[in-house]
UniProtKB/Swiss-Prot annotation:
Keywords annotated in UniProt: Lyase, Pyridoxal phosphate, Schiff base
Quaternary context: In the presence of PdxT, forms a dodecamer of heterodimers.
Lineage of source species: Bacteria, Bacillati, Bacillota, Bacilli, Bacillales
GO MF annotation: an example: pyridoxal 5'-phosphate synthase (glutamine hydrolysing) activity
Protein name per Swiss-Prot or TrEMBL: Pyridoxal 5'-phosphate synthase subunit PdxS
Organism whose genome encodes this protein: Staphylococcus haemolyticus (strain JCSC1435)
Residues annotated to bind D-glyceraldehyde 3-phosphate: 166
Class in the EC hierarchy, top level: lyase
Amino acid sequence: MSKIVGSDRVKRGMAEMQKGGVIMDVVNAEQAKIAEEAGAVAVMALERVPSDIRAAGGVARSANPKIVEEVMNAVSIPVMAKARIGHITEARVLEAMGVDYIDESEVLTPADEEYHLRKDQFTVPFVCGCRNLGEAARRIGEGAAMLRTKGEPGTGNIVEAVRHMRKVNSEVSRLVVMNDDEIMTYAKELGAPYEVLKQIKDHGRLPVVNFAAGGVATPQDAALMMELGADGVFVGSGIFKSEDPEKFAKAIVQATTHYQDYELIGKLASELGTAMKGLDINQISLEERMQERGW
């Protein structure tokens, strides 16, 4: 009997339901409950937040299934979990556990340096990172139902997420005015599937939601990414590495929803403690940048 896989329409529809919301990284049931109470639309269960993964070095793998299960039992909102790029078995284990989404993530150490997962062969929907339209189209071609900027995880520095969001949007704007012959050439230039680029042209935008991720540390950061066209926001280290996680979580949710209410955002920010300590992207070598993982 052939394996039943979810259709693109169903998977993308599930991701569309998270639009306009905040998805928070959590490492235990207690943090998951804080995220849910703050208004998160989903949580990402993992063993360590990106800043701790960066600090520890070594090989970062998918979370212990026990942690994922504890988070799933603690909240009623969707639960995501990360698998290494190309690690079929990590992803299959998470699918068997019943997680709502899998993030094929560059935050973890890649398991395969040539191939990403064939996400269209899974029932569970996948989210993947991208820095440009080529990466976005390749991931969609493999079956990703949701995208996010890669940014530079664990830095508390929004600059790379801004760069990636602007890059994708500008390349989509360039694509939508092309004719079919030009799209064929552009597909070759980007190393992207022609059919996916044609789909993007016909939609006038990416056919899946594209969230901001990688460096969101303050309510202002979250609002900025929404202003730039993000469909929602992932927050990794920014909440639970802050002085007051509960307040930061609620403030980031509010700022994401009301991203053009600058008076409210200012009020929210003024009532918070210290944000997580940030890293200057220029002090991180190319070899140490998580965004460079994947192809």
